[in-house]
C-alpha cells in the first residue's frame, strides 16, 4: 500500500477532511473527559524543525505522548541535514527508524522531496508556501462553534502568505467562499488565485470584505524571516487592522481567528483577542487534537483504533 503524506490540504479528499475534523472533535472530548487512548504505543514521531515554533512543537510532542508514543525533536544542529546531507539520503535513513515524520521548514520543495524518498508518512508542519495543520485546527474550531463551514463566507485580512494560501485550498476542499483583502503588492500567489478562482476572490475594500462574513481571519504583518520589512509593512498594512468594529459589519454569528502569536496594536487591535467573538484560544488548543487525528489517520493501517 502506498504511503499517504500530508503536505497540503489537497492531499486528502473533502470527505476525508470532514471525517478528520469530526474525529479531532471526538479526540478533544475524550481528552477533556480524562479518557486514556494510546494507539501509538511503541511508535515514534520524528520532528524536524528548521523554523522555531511554540504551538507546533508542544502540540505534536504532547499529542504523541498522549497517544502512548514517543517524539524526537531534531533541530538543524541535530541532523546531518544541517551539514549538507542530501535530503533524499536523510529521508531514507530517518524514515527507516521512525513511524511518521513532521517537518517545519522554509522551502516547500524540501518537504516534497523528503516525501518522495520517505518510507513513512510526512506531515508539513509549515513551509513558506503552506500551513495545512493550522487549517485543520481552524476548521475543527469552526465546526465546534458553528457547525459546517460549507457555503459560508470567510474573509482573510492582510498578507497573502502561507496561511492565506492554505485558506484558499481550504475553500476548495471544504466548500466555502473566501474573500481576500490584501494591500497592493501583497496579494496571494497568482497561480493559486487562478486555480481557486471558483471559490476565492480579491476585495479591494477591507470593510466590504468583512460584510456578512461568518469568519474573519488574519495573521502577522511580517512572517518569520521578514523582520527587516517590518516598518514598511506596518505602514502598508495599517488600514487592515482587524478590530471589533470590523466584525460588527459581519454576520451576527461571526467568529474571529488568528494562528498566533499575535501582535496587539498591529494586525489586531489591543482588545480583539478578548472580544467574545474571538475563538483563538480554542483554535490554539485544537492544534493538539487536529494533529492527533491527522497522525491517527495516516497510521490507521498500523494501529488499533478506538
From Swiss-Prot:
Q: Which GO terms describe its biological process?
A: arginine biosynthetic process via ornithine; citrulline biosynthetic process; L-arginine biosynthetic process
Give the record's keywords alphabetically: Amino-acid biosynthesis, Arginine biosynthesis, Cytoplasm, Transferase
A UniProt-annotated Pfam family: OTCace_N
Q: Which reaction does it catalyse?
A: carbamoyl phosphate + L-ornithine = L-citrulline + phosphate + H(+)
- Tell me which EC number(s) this protein carries: 2.1.3.3
The UniProt entry's GO CC annotations, sorted and at most eight, read: cytoplasm
Major place of residence: cytoplasm
Q: Where does carbamoyl phosphate bind?
A: 53-56, 80, 104, 131-134, 259-260, 287
The molecular function terms of the Gene Ontology recorded here are: amino acid binding; ornithine carbamoyltransferase activity
The record's subcellular location field reads: Cytoplasm
What pathway does the annotation place this protein in?
Amino-acid biosynthesis; L-arginine biosynthesis; L-arginine from L-ornithine and carbamoyl phosphate: step 1/3
Domain of life, per lineage: Bacteria
Give the binding site residues for L-ornithine.
162, 219, 223-224
What family name appears in the similarity comment? Answer: Belongs to the aspartate/ornithine carbamoyltransferase superfamily. OTCase family.
- Known function: Reversibly catalyzes the transfer of the carbamoyl group from carbamoyl phosphate (CP) to the N(epsilon) atom of ornithine (ORN) to produce L-citrulline.
UniProt name for this protein: Ornithine carbamoyltransferase
Q: Which organism is it from?
A: Psychrobacter sp. (strain PRwf-1)
Top-down, what is the taxonomic lineage of the species of origin? Answer: Bacteria, Pseudomonadati, Pseudomonadota, Gammaproteobacteria, Moraxellales
Query: What gene does this protein come from?
Result: argF
